[in-house]
Regions:
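Active-site loop/lid in soluble adenylation, ligation, and acyl-transfer enzymes
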Residues: 1-129
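A long amphipathic alpha-helix within ATP-dependent nucleotide-binding catalytic cores
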Residues: 149-181
Length: 226
């Protein structure tokens, strides 16, 4: 296998069969030794975090595939903390797709003059460029089309997939007595332009509350698999 990309929390290898292998690491983003999923640099190492991230990703990707929603997931190997995935091209230089069920975080910082903290949102979808230097700026549907990053049809497909996937995750959290406030995803497309969910679904990609209190990502992982 050939190492093709070294990421903050995962390394990517090209396999002989044309697929790719994601190696989940115990490195997490943060600052000054404090875990913060919103940071853009590795801040510390937490033993076992790669394993729990892979297990949650495996759980949800299988559930999403079973619902008829396409992902790049092939199989996971918990012994070496890896996941085999189908090849996929990212949109532009990478996009993050956020689905919001309540007004918190950056949404509240932007629009706090118009909405109350924690107000319900109707599975509101927004997209941002993955650009650390520019603070991951928001981009509209029209902007993505004008820039040639995706078609209107692809945007609508992603928005629909995002709402469906978010409901799957939200329902699962609700069954465990927790509430999903928001979650972020990444998407790619195959040689035929067909959209698929890529990367991971792990505790660091979502904001979950219990009895009105925010649950830290590592605690969420423990509660989820309890």
């Amino acid at each position: 296998m050939k190492l093709v990309y070294t990421g903050k929390t995962k390394n990517v290898f090209e396999m002989e069969n044309g697929n790719y292998l994601l190696k989940f690491k115990d490195d997490v983003t943060g600052k000054d030794g404090v875990f913060d999923p919103g940071m853009n640099e590795v801040g510390l190492t937490i033993e076992g975090v790669g394993d729990v991230n892979l297990r949650m990703t495996d759980y949800f990707f299988k559930k999403i595939n079973a619902a008829g929603i396409r992902t790049h997931f092939v199989q996971a190997n918990f012994d070496d903390t890896t996941m085999e995935v189908l090849p996929a091209k990212v949109f532009g230089k990478g996009l993050e797709v956020i689905c919001r069920r309540r007004a918190v975080g950056s949404f509240l910082r932007r629009y706090g003059d118009y909405i109350e903290d924690g107000a319900e949102l109707p599975y509101y979808v927004e997209m941002t460029f993955k650009d650390d230097a520019k603070g991951d700026p928001l981009v509209t549907r029209e902007g993505l089309i004008v820039l040639g990053i995706m078609t209107g049809e692809q945007y609508d497909t992603i928005a629909d997939m995002t709402r469906r996937i978010t409901k799957i995750v939200a329902d699962d959290m609700a069954d465990k007595g927790m509430e999903l406030y928001d979650i972020k995803f990444e998407y790619g497309y195959d040689a035929n332009g067909e959209v698929m969910l890529i990367d991971e679904i792990a505790s660091g990609n979502m904001r979950v509350y219990k009895d009105g209190e925010y649950i830290q990502p590592m605690e969420l992982s423990e509660l989820f698999f309890k």
